[in-house]
Amino acid sequence: MADLNLTLKIWRQDGPTEPGGFKTYDISDLNTHMSFLEMLDVLNENLVNSGDEPVAFDHDCREGICGMCSMVINGRPHGPLEGTTTCQLHMRHFNDGDTVTIEPWRAKPFPVLKDLIVDRTPFDRIIQAGGFVSVNTGSAPDGNAIPIGKDISDDAFDAAACIGCGAC
């Protein structure tokens, strides 16, 4: 449980029509066992205590199943670990003295609402419509009567494991 000191470069933007930019914060004495979102909570507590506005970021379950915590960390969706959501990323994956750049998705369909929060409405509509399948395929056959190869079942499992974060 070592202490960690980081420099954070965080995208700040007041609203969808306002210009945004990176603002730098130093944060110290972080527990390496805390999650990335807990680190942002600590930063926000420090900002509020000093009279500054907290960083707006989206989250819901904090269990890696909802996809609301999506952000880009050091140029990668969700951060340095593949297959790990932002809320499941722990500070032990960073080194003391690191500079961590945090920004919202950079996609035209996801306009920034404030700081790290984006408008996910277009993506949510796709998910509500059943994903990317837009062809009427008729009624479903009996799933137990059709042999499925391992490579196809692996792909299907990957699709079923989607949490709707929008990183794809």
Question: Regions from the language model: what does each represent?
Answer:
Residues M1-A167:
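Signature of N-terminal electron-transfer/Fe-S-associated modules in redox systems
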